[in-house]
Amino acid sequence: MSRVIGIDLGTTNSCVAVMEGGEPVVIANAEGNRTTPSVVAFKNGERIVGEAAKRQAITNPDNTVISIKRHMGSAHKETLEGNQYTPEQISAMILQKLKADAEAYLGQSVTQAVITVPAYFNDSQRQATKDAGKIAGLEVLRIVNEPTAAALAYGMEKTEDQTVLVFDLGGGTFDVSILELSDGFFEVKATSGDNKLGGDDFDDVVMNYLVSEFKKEHGIDLSKDRMAQQRLKDAAEKAKKDLSGVLTTTISLPFITADATGPKHLEMNLTRAKFEELSAELVERTMGPTRQALKDAGLTPSELDRVILVGGSTRIPAVQEAIKKFTGKEPHKGVNPDEVVALGAAVQAGVLTGDVKDVVLLDVTPLSLGIETLGGVFTKLIDRNTTIPTSKSQVFSTAADNQTSVEIHVLQGERQMAGDNKSLGRFNLSDIPPAPRGIPQIEVSFDIDANGIVNVRAKDLGTGKEQRITITSNSGLSDDDIDRMVKDAELNAEADKQRKEQVEVRNEADQLVFTTEKTLKEVEGKIDQAEIDRANAAKDKVKAALEGSNFEEIKTAKDELSEIIQQISVKLYEQAAQAQAAQGGGAEGQEPKKDNVVDADYEVVDDKK
């Protein structure tokens, strides 16, 4: 049976896990690391994902994409080497890398996954994540909120009743969820967050500070230099991480730029106090959603049993201090903030496949859902923090006499006016019999599934005519678009496979040239010179092929040389066998003499007796 993997598709890093022997286990990637940078690049037509993509970002910033998760569910496009890609396609490339690493670990094909998203992701962003999975060749069995997944991993072995606050500050998003845990029962009471707040923003304030200080000193604006920007970004991220463990760090970027007077170097000390001053507003921004979640759950900080920190950015001391001050509790540090979400996704995968028993998960919708009504008012049908799956219906009517159609404008958010909320989509219900306004009965029904994805239905109760819509992401990807992207992804995977095969054949050919030269030196005088000349000619043919880029030429030349070397090896083996046989015959002729010697020894011993 095919295994189901759990994936934390993160803004800056991603992680994949699977259930092994009843326990969730993180799968290391091909590079041996437990997390994979969510970075995609193209270089000379080759697609690079993960650690290798991150390493080359400084020299190839225009064709490298970072933090694509921040654009999920939008119409944003990335142009890489002249080709345009949607956020779903870029995310699918990351998912394909995680899928391949999981398949290498498990030794079998993987076609199904549970993928996590920020709790505060809206419907478009959730649908976009499912689309990315489909493009990557994965059936997404469930979309799980990241804080909920973290609580699943944390609460697996806990039997006592607990009320926990999950504080999840990742690379690009922030979520806070309040859950009640009770021996396998996980119920989300409230969730809140900010999809535009994360570790990237902490990096940016350091970056902006470095740019400002450098401009003061040298009069050069580094924000206009793409390559310098990438170096600054990496240095800012490293400084941020360093300051979680030390009080001061040195940022050194030699040859960051140059002017008429020569090269310029950036050398600066950054203290933790200065970093906290620069990022104070960001830390304070995490407190708003935290207060809101507690308020929605009807709880006070003193009623919390535990605070769980999730996401790499929760390692920042000021963040830990802020949540400790607000809740009055020392945050729990018994989980790895980089891995716990993927582990929770694997647990949910286990629940869906039946490998994990006695776990019940009740999640909530993060934002209110409704429609636009007369005057541009947002009329809510489902309030935020409603347990999902759920459905709700309400009857509306026409706004004008003899109105024969109505447009249903579906929205998600908390503002009073429709225009201030997130538009999820529009659809029309037509052929309504003409009647005075207020007479037709239009029933609008919302269904939210366990993934948090919305289906809307409008029905004319008079005629029974019905219209449905499944909300799709704002990227506007149709089924045909997704199918085309799936095929493109498959072709890319095949191209990657061929490219890998070509590299391997080239390496094998190079190695064969080296071993041939070594072998021919060793066999001089032992085989005919004609055979040595033939091998040398074949070796030179391989070397010439390696100078070019014709894969078939390299492969053919390599195979020819390999066959010649094999024939030489067989002859050497036969010669060695004949020589051994000749030596063996001589030894047999001496055996009787050896027996006589032994007998003589025994005779001497007997004489002494």
Swiss-Prot record:
Disulfide bridge positions per record: none
A GO molecular-function annotation: ATP-dependent protein folding chaperone
Compositional bias per record (Acidic residues), positions renumbered to this chain: 598-609
UniProt KW keywords: ATP-binding, Chaperone, Nucleotide-binding, Phosphoprotein, Stress response
Induction section of the entry: By stress conditions e.g. heat shock.
Domain of life: Bacteria
Ranges for region Disordered: 580-609
Gene3D superfamilies (alphabetical): 1.20.1270.10, 3.30.30.30, 3.30.420.40, Actin, Chain A, domain 4, Substrate Binding Domain Of DNAk, Chain A, domain 1
Any Pfam family matching the protein: HSP70
Coiled coil: none
Keyword Chaperone attached: yes
Residue positions where Phosphothreonine is found in the record: T173
Function recorded in the entry: Acts as a chaperone.
Stated family: Belongs to the heat shock protein 70 family.
Protein name: Chaperone protein DnaK
